[in-house]
Amino acid sequence: MPSVKVRDNEPFDVAMRRFKRSCEKAGVLAEVRSREFYEKPTQERKRKLAAAVKRNSRRLKKERSRFERLY
């Protein structure tokens, strides 16, 4: 759990912003959302595989476009 120490003469808004940023970096909200409902192991594998395929296709698309521009 992220924690933030409020500095001397620091406004509450600034401390709150720092806390929100640290929570976002730690992935707290994403973790809560993913654990909100039970996901079967097969569904989790399918979701992760689909994300990997999407990432790979994006990477290949970037590589192809980079090589096309060279000539």
UniProtKB/Swiss-Prot annotation:
Keywords carried by this UniProt record: Ribonucleoprotein, Ribosomal protein
Keyword Ribonucleoprotein: yes
GO cellular component: ribonucleoprotein complex; ribosome
GO biological process: translation
A GO molecular-function annotation: structural constituent of ribosome
Coiled-coil annotated residue ranges, if any: none
UniProt record similarity statement: Belongs to the bacterial ribosomal protein bS21 family.
HAMAP family, alphabetized: Ribosomal_bS21 (MF_00358)
Protein name, as recorded: Small ribosomal subunit protein bS21
Organism (species): Dichelobacter nodosus (strain VCS1703A)
Lineage start: Bacteria, Pseudomonadati, Pseudomonadota, Gammaproteobacteria, Cardiobacteriales
